[in-house]
UniProtKB/Swiss-Prot annotation:
Remaining remarks: DNA conjugation in M.smegmatis is unidirectional with distinct donor and recipient strains; mc(2)155 is a donor strain while MKD8 is a recipient strain. Mutations in a donor strain that alter DNA transfer do not always alter DNA transfer in a recipient strain.
Family: Belongs to the mycobacterial PE family.
Pfam families: PE
Lineage: Bacteria, Bacillati, Actinomycetota, Actinomycetes, Mycobacteriales
Superkingdom of source: Bacteria
Function: Part of the ESX-1 / type VII specialized secretion system (T7SS), which exports several proteins including EsxA and EsxB. Plays a role in DNA conjugation, in at least a donor strain.
Disruption phenotype: Increases efficiency of DNA conjugation when disrupted in donor strain.
Protein name, per record: Uncharacterized PE family protein PE35
Amino acid sequence: MQPMTHNPGAEAVAAQVIANAARGLAGGTTASAAVTALVPAGADEVSALAAVAFASEGVEALAANAFAQEELTRAGAAFAEIAGIYNAVDAANAATM
């Protein structure tokens, strides 16, 4: 039988994943103003339509980014919870020995 171990540093990694997701979400929020407020290159209809199309695609990309960052936050929280459970069980078992 192989020995089973758990690295207590997993909680720190989970916290880093959550922090990275928060930074990614903040970056997307910051970028939203620049992406949606693009000024057309010229006064013609094509430039106006291109600016609208770019803004529309940008909004979709920002929504996908927000969803991805929320998923990373949930994953980091799950890792933190699991690591906390492992650490608590290990500490309890060590105290009984």
